[in-house]
Amino acid sequence: MVRLTLDLIAKKSNLKPRKEETTLQYLKKITHINFSAKNIDAIEDLSLCKNLSVLYLYDNCISQITNLNYATNLTHLYLQNNCISCIENLGSLKKLEKLYLGGNYIAVIEGLEGLEGLRELHVESQRLPLGEKLLFDPRTLHSLAKSLSILNISNNNIDDVRDLEILENLNQLIAVDNQLLHVKDLECLLNKLMKLWKMDLNRNPVCLKPKYRDRLILVSKSLEFLDGKEIKNMERQFLMNWKASKDAKKISKKRNSKNEDISNSHRRISL
């Protein structure tokens, strides 16, 4: 196994120092570090890399997120396909915009309080014990309520997404290969997520429910793509007209029934 150290970065970086440049000056200059698929199992103190903005550490053996407190300029962090079981030590990354944590061992989405600039969170395909599902800490969801725009929670045995209603600026939700079952729950979610324009729920049990697609299109005016298929204006208008006609018939039937009851009541009185 390999530890990510300053020496390793200095040796392997694509950015080569000038002759007159000291190691310290060189490390301060680095903005991108890519050590994906290098058998990295731990992150050492990299605090000299003051200007680091993008860190690629996917496809490694990292079990704990450590020594990133210094990286206050970090905007993109790629940690997918490691051995991480807990989201921690990220509170100081105030500029972080994109966080990739798919393919780890994370059971609870937590520890993201204070990351008010986070726009994308990718936590798909966690390697959970059989029968367990990915959970969301309400404090983390509350912290991300205004910033998060893209969320990928695919393949995590999730059967309820109502907790996500708080994410008011979410515009893309990818939740394929889960256990979502109830159309009503999705209707409630879409009623809250007024900016959502793309939702992918392929290979969930709910997709097999009657009128599943029609009901979701009717409840959301912002949705443009559902399960990878574009929602055409003609399709939405047809469904709206159909619903209006159906509602009108219901009202008419109710009114006729009420009038009939009144008529029968008058007839009984006259008798």
Provide a role label for each language-model segment.
Residues 1-85, 94-150, 191, 195-200, ...:
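The feature captures the LRR N-terminal capping module
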Residues 142-203:
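Structured C-terminal portions of repeat-based eukaryotic scaffold domains
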